[in-house]
Amino acid sequence: LKKVNVSLRPIVSNINLPTVIKTAVLPGDTMESIFVATQVGEIFYIRNRIARLFLDIRQRIIELGTNGGYDERGLLGLAFHPNFYYNGLFYLHYSKAGTQGQGALSGSFHPNPCEPETLSLRWVNRNTQYDHIDTVEEWILQPSGQSQRRRTLLNLRRPFLNHNGVNNLNFSPETGRLVLTTGDGGSGYDPFNLSQNMMEIAGKIIEIDVNTDILINNLPAVTRFNELPEAVQRTLTVIVKGTRNIPGIAFQRYNNQYIKYVGNVGQDLVESVFSFTYYKPIPVTEIISASTQNRSLNEDGLVNLGWRGWEGDLPTPIINPCLSNPSLVEETIAYYNEAISVATKRILPLTCYYHMDPRPDKFSGTALTGIQPYMGSEIPDLTGCIVFIDFVRRGSTPARGVLAYTKVRTECKLNDYSIIEPNYNFGTQSAYYVSLGANLTQSRLYLGVYGSSNVTDFNQGTVFEIV
């Protein structure tokens, strides 16, 4: 794959950290507007390079940056109903104000194969030992132009502050359902192995039938599917497990089907992009029924990304400096038994890139923060390709994110990828690549850049169009 050169055209600047970039046609309007959600809780819509406030829910968002400025909570998801133009419905995912807890573990977690008890921890006392509560809500844009919350779809109790997913609400053009992409709940190495446990909500991609109009007041905050009211259980199906942290799901029309793209943010070594076409959703009611009857669940057709046994294309490693030479590192398999157990159940990544990569035409990355297919024609070298971004190139000073791309999978092997070089001068300012969005036809791509890794360093965001 060859290196591709692009330009970046600024659309809006001096905003807070952009977590979601999408387009939609407002009711009564004739053209798409660009919508940008910020982590702190604002949603703007942009037309003719003028940003107007669509919604401000900053008072509803948990206090961010209390750990030094970096945070993975906040307003993380925004999706517009397929019939938004007619019904005004849209959906939000955010971390709720006033729900700060103490966390599920007092310290950091590191698995150690020589200490088997570290490989089988359980999340106990969940009602008190959690970090925060995330909510998924349905809102409606009223004819007056004001938006109002209609109902809560889910309240999720999260064990740690990180790995909540980002850009984590998207509608499936195949099923018309709302797709929630959740991370494994955080810390590191998935301490409680939530992502492989089918009863756990964490670490899954879930489809929600929003057309079943269920209104339940005071919906409980839950961690497992069987804690949900039965009426809510009936609206949910699981399509993917084994996620670690995930920047949304994207759909690419290909012949008469859709290819789905999802990414797993890596632990210490591997960032992965996955693609799949076929899947068989498993109703949550079936998961609960199998558990209640103590029978094994038929997971045929369920997509498994392999985490925590696998980090992309490698068994999840623990990286330590060599005792004899601290400038070198050794990689130890963290969860050997889990890796061989999941090996035949997982799908293989479409492409991977690494935190340490000496190859001259590659880069050493940090965290995958967005994936979008590009179906436009203005950048012909990228037409039909899958574009992805990394938060920050390792060792770059000042900090610079990375744009890259790969192609649709045609062979049963790991795809190569190549770097996209943006012709833009950020000067001495840091440029962390935090979000990647597209318009409705995927003919335009939008890049969210932030001047700091800390959400509480306010108003350092720019959204660009990639041209």
Predicted regions: what they are:
Residues 103-170:
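Asp-box/WD-like beta-propeller blade repeats and closely related beta-sheet repeat scaffolds
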Residues 65-68, 73-75, 85, 97-98, ...:
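Beta-propeller domain segments
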Residues 50-80:
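Blade-loop segments of beta-propeller domains
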Residues 1, 30-58, 143, 400, ...:
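Beta-propeller domains
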Residues 56-59, 153-158, 421-426:
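Short loop/turn motifs that cap or connect beta-strands within the blades
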Residues 10-41, 365-375:
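Beta-strand-rich domains and repeat architectures in extracellular enzymes and scaffolds
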Residues 1-17, 146-151, 232-234, 420-422:
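A short helix->beta-strand "capping" segment at the edge of beta-propeller domains
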